[in-house]
Amino acid sequence: MGEDAAQAEKFQHPNTDMLQEKPSSPSPMPSSTPSPSLNLGSTEEAIRDNSQVNAVTVHTLLDKLVNMLDAVRENQHNMEQRQINLEGSVKGIQNDLTKLSKYQASTSNTVSKLLEKSRKVSAHTRAVRERLERQCVQVKRLENNHAQLLRRNHFKVLIFQEESEIPASVFVKEPVPSAAEGKEELADENKSLEETLHNVDLSSDDELPRDEEALEDSAEEKMEESRAEKIKRSSLKKVDSLKKAFSRQNIEKKMNKLGTKIVSVERREKIKKSLTPNHQKASSGKSSPFKVSPLSFGRKKVREGESSVENETKLEDQMQEDREEGSFTEGLSEASLPSGLMEGSAEDAEKSARRGNNSAVGSNADLTIEEDEEEEPVALQQAQQVRYESGYMLNSEEMEEPSEKQVQPAVLHVDQTA
């Protein structure tokens, strides 16, 4: 662009120079006297020449401008292509970077997995090392024991054979009475075991001669006999133990123990005394000749704050309590005493029941009414004794005949008011 402007200036400068030169030329002419027609023609020619030159210069300048614009357009087109190429290369670089990031993530995952596996392998290697160290220690111990056995010449090899087993006499055990004897017996058993182990043949069956085969047959027969004897002894011992366990004495002892646990000895003696027919309770001198009487009459004065109805209810409550105590003692006696004693008690109860029935028939005739105030405690004692004995007899009758109804003694109170 700068060069084109300089060239345009050059084209303009010569035209201006020509114009300057042309007007200077007529300056000397005034000395001469030219004609005015000639002067007009020369000026017109000069103007035409200047116009032609200006048109040419403008045309050339326009051509140059067109060329310059074409060049600029080409340069811009090239720049656009280069920019497009740069954008494609940048996109390719971005794709490569994304691929690299993906590869890096996958490699990081694989590296983490490898690290975990390496840790596990290291843990396994440590465990293996520990096991190997333990095995080395055990091997060293075995080597030491082996060396000691070889030095002592006590190296033994035991081969299990179904036909030739260890004799049963070695395994027979007797009861140990004391600690010292037990130690001696253990030492003897160990010696016998060692002897039998030494006697075991280690050679194969092919190398044995016929005489040794005969000896083995005899040994097998002896072993079978010893086994049969063992089985017989064990069975006899078991039978004896069962007989002892289920003997009558052991059962009686166990029953007595259970009875003592349920009922104490003192209580049992009291129950026995109460069941014996010859046993008689102490009674007052003024009592009736018959022990059991279903009817009894007593007299009491009515004191202050008490009524006849309250006295009757109290006496009935006492009668019920006595009956409950009698039935409870009889139940305990049946649970604690053995079968033989229970049979005897049942017979005694039958006898006493019969006596009670007989006495009940005759006691209806003897009814005493005491009216003296001084004999009131004696009458109370008699009434309590009659209640106790009648309750006992009724309980015995209930044991023999549960279907019969209980006969309650009728207590009749005669209250006198002064």
From Swiss-Prot:
<dbReference type="GO" id="GO:0001786">
    <property type="term" value="F:phosphatidylserine binding"/>
</dbReference>
<feature type="modified residue" description="Phosphoserine">
    <location>
        <position position="204"/>
    </location>
</feature>
<feature type="modified residue" description="Phosphoserine">
    <location>
        <position position="284"/>
    </location>
</feature>
<comment type="similarity">
    <text>Belongs to the CAVIN family.</text>
</comment>
<keyword id="KW-0963">Cytoplasm</keyword>
<feature type="region of interest" description="Disordered">
    <location>
        <begin position="200"/>
        <end position="238"/>
    </location>
</feature>
<feature type="compositionally biased region" description="Basic and acidic residues">
    <location>
        <begin position="303"/>
        <end position="321"/>
    </location>
</feature>
<feature type="modified residue" description="Phosphoserine">
    <location>
        <position position="283"/>
    </location>
</feature>
<feature type="coiled-coil region">
    <location>
        <begin position="61"/>
        <end position="87"/>
    </location>
</feature>
<feature type="modified residue" description="N-acetylglycine">
    <location>
        <position position="2"/>
    </location>
</feature>
<feature type="modified residue" description="Phosphoserine">
    <location>
        <position position="27"/>
    </location>
</feature>
<feature type="modified residue" description="Phosphoserine">
    <location>
        <position position="203"/>
    </location>
</feature>
<dbReference type="Pfam" id="PF15237">
    <property type="entry name" value="PTRF_SDPR"/>
</dbReference>
<feature type="modified residue" description="Phosphoserine">
    <location>
        <position position="296"/>
    </location>
</feature>
<dbReference type="GO" id="GO:0005829">
    <property type="term" value="C:cytosol"/>
</dbReference>
<keyword id="KW-0175">Coiled coil</keyword>
<comment type="function">
    <text>Plays an important role in caveolar biogenesis and morphology. Regulates caveolae morphology by inducing membrane curvature within caveolae. Plays a role in caveola formation in a tissue-specific manner. Required for the formation of caveolae in the lung and fat endothelia but not in the heart endothelia. Negatively regulates the size or stability of CAVIN complexes in the lung endothelial cells. May play a role in targeting PRKCA to caveolae.</text>
</comment>
<feature type="region of interest" description="Leucine-zipper">
    <location>
        <begin position="62"/>
        <end position="100"/>
    </location>
</feature>
<feature type="modified residue" description="Phosphoserine">
    <location>
        <position position="336"/>
    </location>
</feature>
<dbReference type="InterPro" id="IPR026752">
    <property type="entry name" value="Cavin_fam"/>
</dbReference>
<feature type="compositionally biased region" description="Acidic residues">
    <location>
        <begin position="368"/>
        <end position="377"/>
    </location>
</feature>
<dbReference type="GO" id="GO:0045944">
    <property type="term" value="P:positive regulation of transcription by RNA polymerase II"/>
</dbReference>
<feature type="modified residue" description="Phosphoserine">
    <location>
        <position position="390"/>
    </location>
</feature>
<feature type="compositionally biased region" description="Basic and acidic residues">
    <location>
        <begin position="220"/>
        <end position="238"/>
    </location>
</feature>
<dbReference type="GO" id="GO:0005901">
    <property type="term" value="C:caveola"/>
</dbReference>
<feature type="modified residue" description="Phosphoserine">
    <location>
        <position position="288"/>
    </location>
</feature>
<feature type="modified residue" description="Phosphotyrosine">
    <location>
        <position position="388"/>
    </location>
</feature>
<feature type="compositionally biased region" description="Polar residues">
    <location>
        <begin position="355"/>
        <end position="366"/>
    </location>
</feature>
<protein>
    <recommendedName>
        <fullName>Caveolae-associated protein 2</fullName>
    </recommendedName>
</protein>
<dbReference type="GO" id="GO:0005654">
    <property type="term" value="C:nucleoplasm"/>
</dbReference>
<keyword id="KW-0446">Lipid-binding</keyword>
<feature type="region of interest" description="Disordered">
    <location>
        <begin position="262"/>
        <end position="382"/>
    </location>
</feature>
<keyword id="KW-0597">Phosphoprotein</keyword>
<feature type="modified residue" description="Phosphoserine">
    <location>
        <position position="396"/>
    </location>
</feature>
<dbReference type="GO" id="GO:0097320">
    <property type="term" value="P:plasma membrane tubulation"/>
</dbReference>
<feature type="region of interest" description="Interaction with CAVIN1">
    <location>
        <begin position="2"/>
        <end position="168"/>
    </location>
</feature>
<feature type="coiled-coil region">
    <location>
        <begin position="126"/>
        <end position="268"/>
    </location>
</feature>
<feature type="modified residue" description="Phosphothreonine">
    <location>
        <position position="368"/>
    </location>
</feature>
<feature type="modified residue" description="Phosphoserine">
    <location>
        <position position="287"/>
    </location>
</feature>
<feature type="modified residue" description="Phosphoserine">
    <location>
        <position position="363"/>
    </location>
</feature>
<keyword id="KW-0472">Membrane</keyword>
<feature type="modified residue" description="Phosphoserine">
    <location>
        <position position="327"/>
    </location>
</feature>
